[in-house]
Amino acid sequence: MPSIQKQRRIIDRAALVGELDALIAGDRTPQEARGGFLDLLKGAMEQGRAEVRSRFDAGEANGEEVAVALSFLADQIVRLIYDFATDHVYPAANPTEGERLCVAAVGGYGRGELAPHSDIDLLFVLPYKETARQEQVIEYTLYMLWDLKLKVGHATRSIDECVRLARSDLTIRTAMLESRYLWGDRKLYNELRRRFYSEVADTSGPEFVEGKLAERDARHTKLGGSRYVLEPNIKEGKGGLRDLQTLYWIAKYLYKVDEVANLVDRGVLTKKEAHRFDRAHRFLWDVRCHLHYLAGRGEDRLTFDVQSEIAALLVYRDRAGARGVERFMKHYYLIAKEIGDLTRIFCAALEAEHQRKPRFRLPSIGLFHKSIDGFEVEGGRLNVRSGSEFRDDPVKILRLFHTAQEEQLDIHPKALRAITRNLHAVDQIRDDPEANRLFTEMLTSKNDPETTLRRLNEASVFGRFVPDFGRVVAQMQHDMYHVYTVDEHTVFAIGILRGIEEGSYGDEMPISSEVVHKIQSRRALYVSVLLHDIAKGRGGDHSELGADIALELCPRFGLSHEETETVAWLVRYHLLMSNTAFRRDINDPQTITDFCAVVQSVERLRLLLVLTAADIRAVGPNVWNAWKAALLRDLYEAAEERLTGGHAAGGRDARIEYAKEEMRALLADLPPSAIDAHIARGYPSYWLSFDADTHAWHARIAHEVESRSEPLTIKNRVDRFKGVTEITIYADDHPGLFSRIAGAMAVSGANIVDAKIFTMADGMALDTFWVQDENGEPFDRADKLARLYARIDQTLAGRLRPREELKKDDGVSSRMRVFKVAPRVLIDNEASRTHTVIEVNGRDRKGLLYDLTRALSSLNLQIASAHISTFGEAAVDVFYVKDVFGLQVTHDSRLNQIRDTLLAVMVQDSDAGADRARPPGDSGTSVAAEVSAAE
């Protein structure tokens, strides 16, 4: 426990007692003096808190010292009030035995730690049943504390009640365990402590340990089950202060120690481990105090909006490839992981002393063997006879995990403790062929590789054996898209890949689940998933840097030259398929030509598809959806056809004629003249952009419009397989039509994910929009569709102005505003032979597509298609456009005008000017290059 420097500058109780004596001197009664006493205490509290805050802000006190100082301040306030109550308000010249009273601090306050805005918890201890005077003193004390605006938790119990309740209630038992004498009758408190240990704690060690660990597990489950959540609760979350406190409670309960350092003397922890405990405790208290002071209340969630502020306060500066806030959060996650290590070590020590039972018993044939591969089997868990085995034969560390995987056994905490204490030995076996064989077999095993890799990572073996992986352990990206740290995402992706192989994702990923069994380079696929993000956080293009790392690591892992080249290629181009599918027009022949020029073989295409699917699915909940699956499937099928010698760009005329004949075959019930009329309407690009079923649907819509002479027709059909609602609008074409429709859809809450816009030969506009609701599901509720139809009609008639409606709410949450996304506009005339491709990156908001298309319309550009993607707070919108003459835009001045106009649209909503803030991706690269669905 840190000592408090210059205590009297925080609060001088002796001086306050003197002022109090002066206050009640003369004829004033204690009741009359209460107001002055209260003012005196308020002033002392304010001055004391200000002094502590000043020390913290100036770096003269750390978080632990703040907690101890604030506890000291509260102690003096409680003592002053108690003394005033017993000496002046309700004095007793000769109190009886039964009127004795003691005040104890419990909870965090009992440990002598008080955060800036935490409650103080008090236990009023009685020898017997409560007397009238005791009730009056307690009531006076509490009311004074409440009048001081303190949050007070309290209980009044006799010693017998305390002991009885502690036996039956784990929470009360814990409160009793960490209680601290505060004021009043010390003998009474000592008697309580004696009886608590003799009648409760001394006889219930294993029960208490199991109860607290079960309580911890339930708490972890409630708060997400991972220490790597984006906005962790530093008190209650996994790897937080409460986990450290749980270890402290167990140690105090079993060993009767008051300091973690005492566990070194008991042989439970080494000096180094006790130092790690203290370091973690100090860091978490620093963060917690900053949180409370910034929030101005008792806040323990490390939310997005304060992460950057605390990172700055703790002087985490930006470095190449990592922002200061990312470095801060990485440190936090590493501390949380270290707390997990300490927990395992501690539990192993407890079990060694038979203080607790094994918590897991996994059924396996291995249970009936005394030993397997040189390891002991104890209660279904692999153990070592001596921790020195790992020091003498470090390869045995990897063999332990390999055997556990093959035999489906858990690993004994004692073995994990021995590994932790011999981690340095792993350095010696990085180039050992046997160690690398074991590692590669674990990675590519059909027996739950995800769990094994997670065990290796939790035990810190993974990052030690593969230092490049160690660099991304706890590496996070400060945005709303990447849910997991890089190491968690990677391990999760391996699990997804194995699930694809097993058929667990047949409904979600049907093509990947089919293709994966045709792949010949299975080892290369698994290693590429392992290494695809290995270079994140280094600055530069992590795909290129990762490919270089793959060339170094793969031979070490035992891969052949051919496999190594394949892995390096997959890592280099692991974003290619998602970027192409989500940001390019797959129906444009140039898209497939460019894509196939890089892929070159069907085997690589299959590998890339499965890698992409596993990568996206492992980004976070709800990132993978039916629409993305459909886009990837369409790209895969088009590329496969091209790579296997199917129709190429040169067969364009033949494909157009084939599309027309396919449509005609589906329209036997329509008059031939109606079919011929629709064929005459469509330009060549139209026939290459939809399947026969959609062409037939369009023909029926056009025929219906002609027969009824309606100026506007809106039709929809729900595509459950793609997870979208397809909305087709047939109307007289005019400039800005797309923009107005996009505005009406934004006002209606429909999110456009794709769009194709055609002006037919007869001057009619045939615009198709694929839309979803706010949850990424088809926009299919009847009431919402009716409202959407009405708003489109009102907008096109000039009765509704989307711009005015959208000004009322831009849909950007306060959490989203925390993130700065640099606006960028990229213009490409090589991605298509017929269109100029414009890619706009920036922060997403409601109505963004409306504003962008409105700007494009003002520039007299014709939009042929739009492809919309969002990545958390970031939007990537791609438009295929032509000028008023139906040509690509090529003149530099015109291109600069387009870029400046679109940047102005993005900058008006951005906290940073163009190119000032790094987009979600690696330093120095554009969102277009880096923010992909798979990153």
Where are these predicted regions, by residue range?
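Active-site-adjacent "gating/activation" loops or surface patches in catalytic cores
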Residues: G98-A104, G110-L114, S118-I120, L362-R385, ...
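Divalent metal-dependent catalytic cores for phosphoryl transfer on phosphate-bearing substrates
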Residues: R111-V137, D265, F277-R279, F283-W285, ...
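Non-catalytic interface/linker regions that flank or bridge core catalytic/transmembrane domains
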Residues: M1-A105, G112-L114, S118-H482, L551
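A short, contiguous, amphipathic alpha-helix enriched in charged residues
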Residues: S71-V89, A93, F492-G503, G736, ...
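Regulatory modules associated with amino-acid/nitrogen control
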Residues: F283-L284, R323-L382, T451, A459, ...
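Acidic/histidine metal-binding catalytic segments
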Residues: T86-E99, A155, H412-A415, R455, ...
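Conserved helix-loop functional segments at active or binding sites
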Residues: D83, D87, G499-E514, D533-K536, ...
